[in-house]
Amino acid sequence: MLTLVAGMAVVAGIRQISGLSPQIKWPNDAVIDGKKICGILTEMSTEEDSIRYVVVGIGINVNTESFPPEISDTATSLKLSLGHELKRAPLIGAVLKSFEQYYSRFMEYGDMTCLLYTSDAADD
């Protein structure tokens, strides 16, 4: 579920900072106009019946100008989509703030239902 929470946070952060409308591509990517803008990976360590820790890795193509030929048809960046560079710090701040909000609600309610109908990441 943390992968989906992170995806929702990425989509909300990008929308807030850039005005673009990315969508979540189940289960761990975000896309703009069908092209991948972000990948999310989670890794969990467990011990018996408990979770020791979870690491969430988020990679957003921010100011990438070109991609290798083998992925150039399926990948994009915020710079390519906007036509100009984007400052990373405000984007990181927006994503982290959204993640904190979504994660708090997820923990409070115990499932994703509370997020699906209220988030910026839901389909329009």
Report the location of each language-model feature.
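Long, positively charged amphipathic alpha-helical accessory segments at protein N-termini or as interdomain linkers
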Residues: 4-22, 32-119
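Gly/Ser-rich oxyanion-binding loop with an adjacent helix/lid
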Residues: 25
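A short, hydrophobic C-terminal helix/tail in secreted or cell-surface proteins
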Residues: 120-124
